[in-house]
Amino acid sequence: MAKYRDYLPQIDGDFFLTRGGLETTSVLQGNVDVSHCAAIELMKTDKGRARLRAYYAPYIDIARDAGAGFILEAPTWRANTDWGQRLGYTAASLSAANRAAIEMLHGMRIAQENRLPIVVSGSIVPLRDGCKEADEMHPCEAAQYH
C-alpha cells in the first residue's frame, strides 16, 4: 500500500503538483457544509467520498497534462485528537477515519498510476488551530502530542 514510503520521487527534482484549498473549495464552491472546516467529515458518507474523488480528479488531470507527478493530499488536516473530539470522534473512530481517507487515496493512485506518479500524503494540523502564531507548538510538545 505505501509505494513511496522509503523514497519520495519529488525529492529528485521532478515536477509535482498538489491540490489546493479543499476545505475552502468544498464550502464555497461545492456548497458543502463541514463542521469546523474539517474535510475528514466528508469521509462519513458515500456522497462525501464521491465529492472528494470528484474534487481530486481535475488536479490529477492537470498534473498528467503537464507531465508532472501529483501529491494526493488526504482530507485529514483537522483529523487530530483535539479537532476529532470537537467533531465527536472517539480515538478509535478518528483513527479509522484517517485510515479510510488514506485507503481511498491509495485506490485513486492505483487507478491512475500508469498515467503519472502519485504520492499519497496525509497531514494532520498541530494542536489547536495551527494557523495562528500563538497556537504554535514547541517541537517537543508536538512530538509528545502526535
Model-derived segments and spans:
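Domain-level signal for soluble alpha/beta catalytic cores
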Residues: M1-H146
